[in-house]
Curated annotation (Swiss-Prot):
This is Penicillin-insensitive murein endopeptidase. The gene is mepA. Its main location: periplasm. GO terms for cellular component: outer membrane-bounded periplasmic space. It comes from Salmonella choleraesuis (strain SC-B67). Keywords: Disulfide bond, Hydrolase, Metal-binding, Metalloprotease, Periplasm, Protease, Signal, Zinc.
Length: 274
């Protein structure tokens, strides 16, 4: 388990050592009315807000990476969720990566988070606030067993389930990505109130955090939403398929060349970087 924790920590800090992308040269939000542009995995943002790093309800991790920017709707969602968590006595919400000042591609660790509508939130709820040293080098708590088939009972809690449920019930949220084993546990514990489970989607990794995605703001005319998740709670055959062994001959997909930037994002780079 210690090796897994080290690997998770390395995943969270590895991007700092990779070559910078042009988007990292933009150090402040681009002025203008907030506009999320294009798709979550190939886009940018004008008029991003800065998430305040000081709050009684949440703490921001790895502030040295300057990934605490997003659409005003995302900032308000984080403030709303963390306030609800505090009201219920769940603990302090730990905020990971949002986006860069103008969005755009990261140098590693994320394919999305480009339009200011994504945020990673640790699935830990400390009752005592973390020190600055802990926040700069966060220790991810792996909730999933080594074989990936279930959560670790001693690490799972109803508070974590409540945090995910609170996020899923927010009207601005369209998807929450978690490890399949975490989704499975949520399905087992949900009882008869299951509508919110539709938004919780199984995905690779995500063993220690949830990745929350908001819908496109109505006034962001170039923003591209994903189709809604399939109807139902997602606890049936689709979820079970994640636990089946890979079919013979299955290979890892080749790394794709990033697609061309949308014209509005290319124009933004041309004006502010190139």
């Amino acid at each position: 388990m210690k090796k897994t924790a080290i690997a998770l920590l390395a995943w969270f800090v590895s991007s700092a050592s990779l070559a910078a992308t042009p988007w990292q040269k933009i150090t402040h939000p681009v002025p203008g009315a907030a506009q999320s542009i294009a798709s979550f995995a190939n886009g940018c943002i004008i008029g991003a807000d800065t998430l305040p790093v000081q709050s009684d309800n949440y703490q921001v991790m790895r502030t040295d990476q300057r990934r605490y920017f997003g659409h005003p709707d995302l900032v308000m969602f984080i403030q709303r969720l963390s306030h609800q968590a505090q009201q219920r006595g769940l603990g302090t919400v730990l905020i990971g990566d949002m986006g860069m000042p103008a969005g755009g591609r990261f140098n590693g660790g994320h394919a999305s988070h480009q339009t200011g509508l994504d945020v990673d939130i640790f699935l830990q709820l400390p009752k005592t606030r973390w020190s600055q040293a802990q926040l700069l080098r966060p220790q991810a708590l792996d909730l999933v067993s080594r074989d990936g088939k279930h959560v670790v009972p001693s690490r799972w809690s109803s508070d974590i389930a409540s945090l995910i449920k609170l996020a899923a019930q927010d009207n601005d949220v369209t998807r929450i990505f978690v490890n399949p084993a975490i989704k499975q546990q949520l399905c087992l514990d949900a009882g008869s109130d299951r509508d919110w489970l539709r938004k919780v989607r199984p995905w690779f990794q995500h063993r220690a955090h949830m990745h929350v995605r908001l819908r496109c703001p109505a006034d962001s005319l170039e923003c591209e939403d994903q189709p809604l998740p399939p109807p139902g709670d997602g606890c049936g055959a689709e979820l079970q398929s994640w636990f089946e062994p890979p079919k013979p001959g299955t290979t890892k997909p080749e790394k794709k060349t990033p697609p061309p930037l949308p014209p509005s994002c290319q124009a933004l780079l041309d004006e502010h970087v190139l």
